Amino acid sequence: MTASDGEEPDVSPADERARESLLPWAGQPAVLLDRHLRVLAATRLARALSPGFRPGVNLVRFTFLDAAGRQDSPSWRAAADHIAALLRESLDRHEGDRGFPAVVGELSATSAAFARSWAGGAPSASSGSVDLPDTAVGRLSLGYRLTRLPDDDSTLVLFEPLDATAREALRRLAVRARRPPASDRPGRPGADPAGRDGAT
């Protein structure tokens, strides 16, 4: 079965384990990354925050290629430097992994911003804040915490609101994220009466 059949694609045991590892944080934005910063799994609320948090997306490529139009934003530059630092730290911990040269080589050749961030050598941080300017509920400033999971060599990223305004915006986003797409609502052509969306 494929996604083009109108159903969810087949899920590998590894993907299923990644999803299950996020169940304790199902009510908040949470993302699980592999050593190359590819998204293994993300909660429904995280996916609603940014297309960069969809499973299968490489967060480094997304930041420097897909979201490159935001390079004039100070918040983008700060986030980009942090993403590059995380990749560098992971590379240092996994010397000999052949996946890293491919990512670093591709981005160094195609993104001047990545080359600058990579050469800058900014240290990584296990916590901080990120500014998301164009979510479905407007600009959101969130805190984040990184936790390395040694059993499967992945990194858990948990986001949380920094103030009451962000908390309310995140609540509204959660409500929106729980709604089925318009095409799936009862009474519309092609609607799925069971309301399935496969989200965590």
Regions found by a protein language model. Name each.
Residues 5-12, 168-171, 175-200:
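Actinobacteria-biased recognition of intrinsically disordered, low-complexity terminal regions
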Residues 26-116, 120-125, 132-133, 150-152, ...:
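PAS-family sensory domains
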Residues 127-129, 144:
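Short, acidic/polar N-cap/turn motifs at the starts of alpha helices
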